Amino acid sequence: MTPVRRRKLFILLFALSVLSAAAALVLYALRQNISLFYTPTQIVAGEAPAKHHIRVGGMVEANSIVRAKKGLDVQFKITDFENTIVVTYSGILPDLFREGQGIVAEGEVTDNHHFHATQVLAKHDANYMPPQVKSALADKVKQ
């Protein structure tokens, strides 16, 4: 192999290794920031990872909202009409949050029936429902 070819091969291998390392770092960084979506049924079945930041969506169950006498703590249940989980949240709830409302909560699973939310998102108007919640609920109605 001539010195010119050897040098080109070395440069090519070096460039490929740098690109591979950069791609690996990007994928690692993206993995840290991904919030996967789960339904209450998937959480009850144990499919959701514990102690990882995820999203859960469903409908707020009737007569399930319990507010603390002092502070901003609130506890409520969300359902996908098959299973129900208890969500605890400390903070100000959105103005549109109410019973029978479709919501998405971000936070961590504490066990198979409890979820600690760090953020609660409610739908915007009477016709809007988060796409993940809509498809998950549609799947339950079909069954």
Swiss-Prot record:
Amino acids binding heme: 124, 128
SUPFAM superfamilies (UniProt xref): Heme chaperone CcmE (SSF82093)
Keyword NADP: no
Record field: transmembrane: 9-29
Domain of life: Bacteria
Cytoplasmic side: 1-8
Ranges facing Periplasmic side: 30-143
Cellular localisation: Cell inner membrane
Keywords: Cell inner membrane, Cell membrane, Cytochrome c-type biogenesis, Heme, Iron, Membrane, Metal-binding, Signal-anchor, Transmembrane, Transmembrane helix
Record carries keyword Aminoacyl-tRNA synthetase: no
Membrane topology value: Single-pass type II membrane protein
GO MF annotations in UniProt: heme binding; metal ion binding
Predominant localisation class: membrane
Alphabetized Pfam families for the sequence: CcmE
Gene Ontology process terms (BP): cytochrome complex assembly
GO CC annotation, single: plasma membrane
The family this protein is said to belong to: Belongs to the CcmE/CycJ family.
Summary of the function given for this chain in its UniProt record: Heme chaperone required for the biogenesis of c-type cytochromes. Transiently binds heme delivered by CcmC and transfers the heme to apo-cytochromes in a process facilitated by CcmF and CcmH.
Listed name of the protein: Cytochrome c-type biogenesis protein CcmE
Organism: Legionella pneumophila subsp. pneumophila (strain Philadelphia 1 / ATCC 33152 / DSM 7513)
Annotated gene: ccmE
